């Protein structure tokens, strides 16, 4: 998009869970990443996949007072905060390790792969 003079921001979401996933997405051109499932897992989600029913047995995706009482909000908030802080620390470390001051300086040059298929399709150098 940049090569064609397009001024759009690219936010990647879906299947991103770890700082490694986030680094790859940003190095490949994403301006930001969005997380949802990973944060829900940190909160305590057990992936019953019934969020839309309002009957989440963990108490996350419900308005039922009995089910809501099962969620320890303080404990869940600490786990989400720990996940986000650890992720941020890992992103800062990777940025420094690759010789950059800003995560948005990352590029394909900072990545490598052992997969010929990935290399052929993404421009990431083959290790």
Go through each PLM region and give its residues.
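Alpha/beta catalytic cores of nucleotide-metabolism and tRNA/nucleoside-modifying enzymes
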Residues: 1-7, 17-23, 27-127
